Amino acid sequence: MSVAAINNNSPESLECPESPEFLERPESQAVRRADRMLVDDRRFGDSRSIEERNVARFSIGAELLAEHDPGHGPVLRRISRADREQLLPLLGDPVLRNAFEDDLVKLENGVRSGFSFGALASRIPDEPAGLGPCERMATPHVRPWADHGSAWVWTEMFPADRVPGELATRLRQLYDGSIEGGPSADPVVPGPEMCRALGRGARLLTALLPWVGPSVLGHVSVVGFTRGESADGPLQSLSGGDPLPSAILMAPERLADPWTVAETLLHESVHLKLFDALRAGALLTDPERSVPIPWRQTPWRLIRVLVALHFYVHLLVFQEAVRNAAPELRAEFGRPPAGEVVDEVTPGTEAARNGTFGTGLERVRYLAGYISELPPGTLTPAGRQLMRWLGEVTAVLDPEPHTAPAPPAAPGPAATPVTAPAAPAAPAATRDAGPEEAVPHRTAGILARPMPAHGELLLADTGTCTLHWLNARSWLVYSLCDGRDVPSVQAEYARRTGTDAPAAASHVTACLEELRNSGLLS
């Protein structure tokens, strides 16, 4: 541009881009970086990876159930062979997902009867449009953020001839089991304005957090409205978890302000995302440990501490995004709330007396600090990975060191059952031969789902009904146990990985031990 043009003071020559990169404040840059980091971790952040693990688990779980529910074996095997696009509507259905999870728990606990998933699935007609069974009942059919997932709105539910009536009955039972309250806790049927307000809040969330917003919304299957009660008073919102999988329920009053809608959707969908991520492995060896919470009267279980920390880190990023919201967002959606959106401290607690722990950052520091001081071995490798990831994201917005870094996961095998620590080592009688003479054999009755894009192998033991997730190293060693003796396994491992003989021997020995302890080798 010429000097003459500038001196003319013409509006065209002096116009500045709306959001020039060179004028962006450091705070906005930090939000952008943290937003991206929250979807980068392949185990906990990358929604596509989480989805693929859940699809593999759903597929192998259906095949496992077919082994123990022969009356519904054909439909269960058909489900186990279905492709991703066919499985997702079933996996996202709250009634079917609840039945599936309940049946897996029965298998893991040694129960071999009373299954419900196969019975329900066998009575549901095929749906060429790709809608889940419960979704077919919704009238009118509304998808509030069709660009970011297949969530639908709980409107009037009419089974008609589309699905068995018992499906509607079961959905209502799951709803009733998710919230407290009497007759006033009936679902609130939303009108067009409520549905539009919900979609508007979702648009705001994805505008504030263009990476996290679409990611977490993709883990929601259904959004309903209610005026139920909770232990802390009128229900504001909840995420279904095990009782009502993939579902969010919220009070209609939360739709009055799009910023509140965005925060509510973030809050509950973050929980649903972690729920899905945790299907692929445990975080703790002692999840029931009691933890004092200064802003609450009642201690929390340790697993709840991790879930809360996961949410509060996301909330930190969201609140920073709100504080730095672009003028065009404020013009479209109005002024954001002046204060920080965080649930209030319980009266009578230490925090209430001291005026502390009223912000998300204070709570992140406390929860992360407590976890960092847990005894060694309390966190599984996946738990340590979660803590490292959350710590790295927090450091972008809160550079003050407040936790000891979680120790890095030791390199080596990972063959841990999903719901329990590894089984005891095989009896000595099965391992009389010396390590150089023994021929490791794979246990019979193992189902498999390879996931080469992730370097993982999912196995299901039809005898013990446990699931095992193997990393790339353990997968390779397991695959080489095809009748070779240990020296041959070590030699082939060294050839394929390019490691020297001592390192190969160390890796293979550790993997074999873990695979034996998990019951996958004899």
Predicted regions and their residues:
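Long, acidic, intrinsically disordered low-complexity segments
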Residues: G201, L205-L209, G241-D276, L390, ...
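Long, charge-dense tracts
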Residues: F22-G182, V188
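Post-HEXXH active-site segment of zinc metalloproteases
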Residues: L255-T264, L272-I303
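Acidic, low-complexity/disordered tracts enriched in E/D and polar residues
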Residues: S2-N9, F22, P26-P74, T416-S479
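Metalloprotease/metallohydrolase-associated module, dominated by Zn2+-dependent proteases
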Residues: P214-H219, F225-D232, S237-P243, P252-L255, ...
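Histidine-centered catalytic/metal-binding microenvironments
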Residues: I371-P417
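Long, charge-rich, low-complexity alpha-helical segments
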Residues: I6, E18-E21, R77-R78, E85-V111, ...
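Auxiliary, metal-adjacent structural segments of Zn-dependent hydrolase domains
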Residues: Y175-P243, R254-L255
